[in-house]
């Protein structure tokens, strides 16, 4: 006969949600930091291709 599974406690559910949200917040923070460094030109780990047209105009 089918028997319902035991219900997990709300504290376990809340803990799982907190871990997930914490990881998401950390990823968002890293993405914002990377975006800011790229926009300000302080990023050292990127190589940008320079178009020949831009060089000739300057």
From Swiss-Prot:
InterPro entries: Ribosomal_bL32, Ribosomal_bL32_plant/cyanobact, Ribosomal_zn-bd. GO terms for molecular function: structural constituent of ribosome. Keywords: Ribonucleoprotein, Ribosomal protein. GO terms for cellular component: large ribosomal subunit. Pfam families: Ribosomal_L32p (PF01783). It comes from the Bacteria. One of its GO terms (biological process) is translation. HAMAP family: Ribosomal_bL32. Belongs to the bacterial ribosomal protein bL32 family. This is Large ribosomal subunit protein bL32. It comes from Prochlorococcus marinus subsp. pastoris (strain CCMP1986 / NIES-2087 / MED4). The lineage of its organism: Bacteria, Bacillati, Cyanobacteriota, Cyanophyceae, Synechococcales.
């Amino acid at each position: 006969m089918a028997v319902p599974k035991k219900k997990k406690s709300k504290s376990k559910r809340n803990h799982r949600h907190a871990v997930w949200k914490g990881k998401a917040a950390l990823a968002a923070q890293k993405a914002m930091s990377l975006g800011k460094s790229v926009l300000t030109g302080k990023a050292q780990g990127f190589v940008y291709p320079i178009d020949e047209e831009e060089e000739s105009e300057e």
